[in-house]
Amino acid sequence: MSNTPFRTGFVAVVGRPNVGKSTLTNALIGSKISIVSRKAQTTRHRIHGVLTREHEQFVFVDTPGFQTRHGGAMNRMMNRVVTQALAEVDVVVHVVEAGKWTDGDAKLLPLLPDARRTILVVSKIDAVKRRDELFAFVSKIVAQHPYDAVVPVSAVKSQQLDQLLDEIAARLPEGEPLFEEDTLTDRPMRFIAAELLREKIFRLVGDELPYGCTVVIEQWEETDKNLRVAACVVVERDSHRPILLGAGGVHMKRIATEARQDIAKLVDKPVHLEVYIKVRKGWSDRESALRDLGYE
């Protein structure tokens, strides 16, 4: 019997919008529980992803990007999610993009906890050709905050991920596992399905569609043999509907097909997915509407 104590705890993955937090979280867990797109602020909720190793259990909290430019109800809500996560977790992983330090990165620094539990992760290091450039970039950041450790990674190429996990594990408190060994997330499957559909929307029409778009699962009927899902895509304006549909419905057909395929992989059975569009004017700037649509 091993004398090594078991460690378990919560790990917040934070950073400015579109810096690679969800890609990193998915890579560490080894499964897709957070959606990814080129569009900033794709992650809106606090997502818990779970990884269990022989002597540790990591509960990763993938947070929305901390927003400093816009002050609408949704952005205020997402910033509350970030600040709450920072206050509650055992370890903070602050993700920055190699070679790209912005005002958004700098404005997050005062919110970071004391150094004993803060790790700086420099993502996308495969895009930096010279080591001296990377060293100079990191040196400027650590001069502004006393990080406990610095780990350069490439989530896409799986570089340095084990080293990052070891650094996190060393800072987790001793304790019993919080979840079963095979648990990947504490979010229900219908939540993940809604997120997968939203990801497809942002990937296909994100450049044309504003942020006032969300997905609500209105029907979820699962049997041993198959799953039937009815999903409502909520937009803010009538003009958003034709963007989503595309000429002859080609956009929506592709969005639904790709989402259905991903959901089928998730539940490991055939899926019938019905998607329709509803206009709810100004929902993203009303806190009551955000709560009605399942935002924290």
Swiss-Prot record:
Residues 41-45 are annotated as: G2. InterPro entries: G_ERA_dom (IPR030388), GTP-bd (IPR006073), GTPase_Era-like (IPR005662), KH_dom-like_a/b (IPR015946), KH_dom_type_2 (IPR004044), KH_sf_prok-type (IPR009019), P-loop_NTPase (IPR027417), Small_GTP-bd (IPR005225). CDD domains: Era, KH-II_Era. Residues 62-65 are annotated as: G3. It is found in: Cytoplasm; Cell inner membrane. Its main location: cytoplasm. GTP binds at residues 15-22, 62-66, 123-126. It comes from the Bacteria. The keyword Cytoplasm applies. It is a peripheral membrane protein. Pfam families: KH_2, MMR_HSR1. GO terms for biological process: ribosomal small subunit assembly. Residues 123-126 are annotated as: G4. This is GTPase Era.
